[in-house]
Amino acid sequence: MPIDTPLIPHKPISRYRSGRLEGLESESSSESDYEEVSDSHDQENSISSSRHVITPVFEKEGISETKTSSNFQNINPVQTIDNSASEYETDASSAEGGSNSAASSSEEEDSSDSEYEMELRRRTLLLPPKFTSKVIKNRAKANEEDTEVLKKVTSQKILEETIKRELLLKETKNNNELLNDIDDTDGIDPQSEYELWKLRHLLRKKRDKEKSLELEREKMAIEERRLMNSEEREAQDLKDAEASRRGKKKSSMQFLQKYYHKGAFYQNEDIVSKRDYSEATEGEVLNKDLLPKPMQIRGDLFAKAGQTRWTHLANEDTTKEGSAWYDPKNPILQKNLHRLGGLHSDSPLSKRKRT
């Protein structure tokens, strides 16, 4: 380990000189040398301590950074120590002291440089804060509000223009359709046109006459009903209901229509036996072919808990080759099919012979 502190020379033994004055001078000279060495040692300690407290100066507007002051560069404490020690010690001791002091000074310089670099890294160049006045802020806010208003106005104008354009296109399209629908075949065959008008005129007269007759019949029926009593009115109502029921033809079952079984009771009554059960009930859709495919479900189970994926047998193919119900290699299935009726030959049953 190199020694950080420099060697301090001890007070040398006074040499023999001829005369008392020479001895005193030598003693005084030795004492002065000792004082010079101690002063140089104190000065070196102050320099080493001051190197750790050097504040860096950042480059700004052409000002260069300085690591140490110019006063410390001119001082070389190693030389002072070596010169003072060489007067009193041998050549070997002076060489050893010089090497140790040089090593310690180089280590101090390295440590000071590293500390300086670390200090530079820690410190960051802080920019001065910029303060904006309230007037500028209010002006910026007003500009933003004006831009938003302009955007809204421009968007509204664009929307109005697009609506007007669409309306004009619709009008032109309608006008073109009307022009295409105009019948400009007048005067081609006047005789046939006259016959067609005559037929239309006769049909119009017939329709008007039928309406007038129907109104007269309704008026007569109202007058007759006013003259009837309560029993006659009930009998007339039953008669009209039966006539309307007979006039209706029984319709066939529609696609996915719910089936209502009429049962075996009250079949001797006409209201049960002659009723059409294929009519749609209240709230039931009659033509489910017009509905979308997900809504084509029997009954009113759409979007309910009882809805299943199976709709009707015509929609499901149960004759697939990979189906388990038609696997000829499955012995359990073949055994069950053999027990069912109508699935095997009509040969007579073979009776077992008694043994």
Swiss-Prot record:
Bias-annotated ranges (Low complexity): 91-105
Stretches with biased composition (Basic and acidic residues): 226-245
One Pfam family this sequence matches: MFAP1
Cellular-component GO terms for this entry: U2-type spliceosomal complex
Superkingdom of the source species: Eukaryota
Stretch forming the signal peptide: none
Region (Disordered): 1-121, 226-253, 336-355
Biased composition (Acidic residues): 24-37, 106-117
Transmembrane segments: none
Biased composition (Polar residues): 65-87
GO biological process, alphabetically ordered: mRNA cis splicing, via spliceosome; mRNA splicing, via spliceosome
Name of the featured protein: Uncharacterized protein C1782.03
